[in-house]
Swiss-Prot record:
Localization (cell): Cytoplasm, Cytoskeleton, Microtubule organizing center, Centrosome
Post-translational modification Phosphoserine, affected residues: S16, S139, S146, S370
Keywords: Coiled coil, Cytoplasm, Cytoskeleton, Metal-binding, Neurogenesis, Phosphoprotein, Zinc, Zinc-finger
Disulfide topology: none
GO molecular function, one term: zinc ion binding
UniProt GO BP: cerebellar molecular layer morphogenesis; dendrite arborization; dendritic spine morphogenesis; negative regulation of neuron projection development; positive regulation of oligodendrocyte differentiation; regulation of DNA strand resection involved in replication fork processing; regulation of double-strand break repair via homologous recombination; regulation of neuron projection development
Task performed by this protein: Involved in the positive regulation of oligodendrocyte differentiation during postnatal growth. Involved in the morphogenesis of basket cells in the somatosensory cortex during embryogenesis. Involved in dendritic arborization, morphogenesis of spine density dendrite, and establishment of postsynaptic dendrite density in cortical pyramidal neurons. Involved in the regulation of neurogenesis. Negatively regulates neurite outgrowth. Involved in homologous recombination (HR) repair pathway. Required for proper resolution of DNA double-strand breaks (DSBs) by HR.
Coiled-coil zones: 170-298
Subunit structure as annotated in this protein's UniProt entry: Homodimers. Interacts with NDE1 and NDEL1. Interacts with DISC1. Interacts with PARP1. Interacts with MCRS1.
Keyword Cytoplasm: yes
Positions of modified residues (Phosphothreonine): T176
Name of protein: Protein ZNF365
Zinc finger (C2H2-type): 26-51
């Protein structure tokens, strides 16, 4: 696109130079189109300086003496014929183009081929004026020749007058043309300056356009890189979100597992605590029963009193166990209840069988004294027995952890 605009600007410069060449209206007939002049005086000086004398004489003849050959015919003609000739010359000049070949008008019937090369271009107005002046001069010379005046002097004077008048006309036309050419030259210089300004502005705009295009390409590259990075970041964000969701699901699952494990642990601890409490109660009950049996064997209580006391103690312990029990207590399990009750009953049967072999009198005496001795305060003689019982209780307490471990 820039190359085409540069070529168009170059063609415009060439057209302007061609227009400058066209503004020179007069060309040399011998040199051609490449030699042009602004005025007729410059063309004449060129012809006198550059070309031969024969060519100059032909040019003067063709430009100044075309009407002298027809003076004899015009003398015998009348004024209406002169008007007809004027109209005829006007028609001829109208049929011709803007520049007329004077040599072809004056020497139309010449046999020499060389003079046809000499062609002087003149405007149509010059030809009309020159022909009218020749006709008037011929009409004036006719009565003078008839009166007997010398025709050669009149012709020379007329030629000098016509040449002087023609030179004045040519100078006036040259001045007018020069003024017009100067005006056109100024306008051309102004247009050329404007064109140079426009061309400089065009070059500046072209450079700005190239800079803008370069920046546009750089910005396009940056935008492409940014779009690619955004796509990569979006993909990474999606992957991280998926990973986060998966981790959250794992955390939720692990939390559920921990909650279930904690709940099971709490339940297990509660059950274990209930079981240990129940076991301790049963151990305590067994110790008390053992102490009671030992005291019964030592004191010789009767069988009925022992059964009554055992039932009272067992009922009281059972009520305490039920009051202190938990929802998940081991006492509520039927298998453990049956196990402990069967074991206790077998132990009680053995104690009953041992007591059955004792004497009836001693049993009756012990029955009478058993309530009093059981509920009376301790004496000095019985202090050792009580201390022995107190010492026996910590030993059983020391044995509790081993039993609990074995049970667990």
């Amino acid at each position: 696109m820039q190359q085409t605009t540069f070529e168009e600007s170059r063609y415009r410069w060439q057209d302007s130079l061609e227009n400058v060449a066209v503004c020179l209206p007069f060309r040399c007939p011998r040199c051609g189109d490449h030699t042009r002049f602004r005025s007729l005086s410059s063309l004449r000086a060129h012809l006198e300086f550059s070309h031969s004398y024969e060519e100059r004489t032909l040019l003067t003849k063709c430009s100044l003496l075309p009407s002298l050959k027809d003076t004899d015919l015009l003398r015998s003609s009348e004024l209406p014929k002169q008007g007809k000739l004027l109209r005829g010359h006007a028609k001829v000049t109208k049929q011709k183009p803007s520049y007329v070949n004077l040599y072809s008008i004056s020497h139309g019937h010449s046999k020499d081929p060389k003079p046809f090369e000499m062609v002087a271009e003149r405007p149509v107005s010059y030809v009309q004026t020159y022909t009218a002046v020749d006709i008037r001069a011929d009409s004036l010379d006719a009565p003078r020749s008839s009166s007997g005046l010398p025709t050669q002097d009149t012709k020379a004077a007329f030629e000098a007058h016509v040449r002087e008048k023609f030179n004045r006309m040519v100078e006036a036309v040259d001045r007018t043309i020069e003024k017009r050419i100067d005006k056109l030259t100024k306008e051309l210089a102004q247009k050329t300056a404007e064109l140079l300004e426009v061309r400089a502005a065009f070059v500046q705009l072209t450079q700005k356009k190239q800079e803008v295009q370069r920046r546009e390409r750089a910005l396009h590259k940056q935008v492409d890189v940014a779009v690619e990075m955004i796509a990569v970041l979006k993909q990474r964000l999606t992957e991280s979100e998926e990973e986060l969701l998966r981790k959250e699901e794992e955390v939720v699952t692990f939390n559920h597992f921990l909650e279930a494990a904690a709940e099971k642990e709490v339940q297990g601890k509660a059950r274990l605590q209930d079981f240990i409490e129940n076991l301790l109660q049963r151990v305590e009950l067994a110790e008390k029963q053992l102490e009671y049996y030992q005291s019964q064997q030592a004191s010789g209580f009767s069988h009925d009193t022992s059964e009554h006391m055992l039932t009272d103690i067992s009922s009281s312990r059972k009520s305490r166990c039920l009051s202190r029990g938990h929802q998940h207590s081991v006492c509520n399990h039927p298998e453990l209840k049956a196990h402990f009750h069967l074991k206790g009953r077998s132990y009680l049967k053995k104690a009953k069988d041992e007591r059955a072999g004792m004497q009836p009198a001693k049993a009756i005496h012990e029955q009478a004294e058993s309530p009093r001795e059981f509920f009376r305060p301790a004496k000095k003689g019985e202090h050792l027995g009580l201390s022995r019982k107190g010492n026996f209780r910590p030993k059983m307490a020391k044995k509790k952890p081993t039993a609990i471990v074995n049970i667990i």
